[in-house]
């Protein structure tokens, strides 16, 4: 796009014509992650001050979607998948396969660019962590989290998410 963009420029700062021109001139890639896994990662990184995962989840639920941190805010409110026609959606845990396809489509040499991913190990680890953390939550918290991330679960195929159950 012909305008100079700074790192801080948000799409909402442009008028509709400029937005359409920009979106039409870029390849749009969206990286997504299961919302429950995002919560676990945020908790493990110490971004909440809660002593337990259950109390952290309660803090998240109490904050609501409008006051939520970007770390756990529902994806649909951050990246607007219904408004922006993304060309590629890359799901966490499938980086090697999906990024390889994306690089190939872009005409770039796949094997020489991609780092070594351990997607299978990551999937197994997060499955185990999800089971452990999910068991700490009350039935009410589980229901509230499913509601909190309802639109993410509807917009993206997180079929193995604990929140989908």
Regions found by a protein language model. Give the residues of each.
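Membrane-interface amphipathic segments in extracytoplasmic regions
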Residues: 1-165
């Amino acid at each position: 796009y012909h305008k100079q963009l700074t790192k801080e420029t948000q799409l909402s700062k442009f008028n509709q014509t400029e937005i359409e021109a920009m979106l039409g001139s870029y390849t749009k890639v969206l990286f997504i992650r299961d919302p429950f896994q995002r919560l676990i990662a945020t908790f493990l990184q110490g971004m909440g001050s809660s002593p337990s995962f259950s109390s952290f989840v309660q803090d998240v639920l109490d904050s609501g979607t409008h006051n939520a941190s970007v770390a756990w805010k529902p994806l649909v409110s951050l990246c607007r998948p219904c408004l922006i026609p993304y060309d590629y959606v890359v799901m966490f845990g499938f980086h090697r396969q999906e990024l390889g396809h994306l690089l190939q489509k872009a005409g770039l040499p796949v094997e020489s660019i991609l780092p070594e991913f351990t997607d299978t190990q990551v999937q197994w680890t997060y499955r185990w962590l999800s089971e452990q953390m999910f068991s700490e939550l009350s039935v009410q918290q589980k229901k509230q989290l499913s509601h909190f991330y309802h639109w993410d679960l509807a917009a993206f195929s997180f079929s193995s998410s604990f929140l989908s159950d």
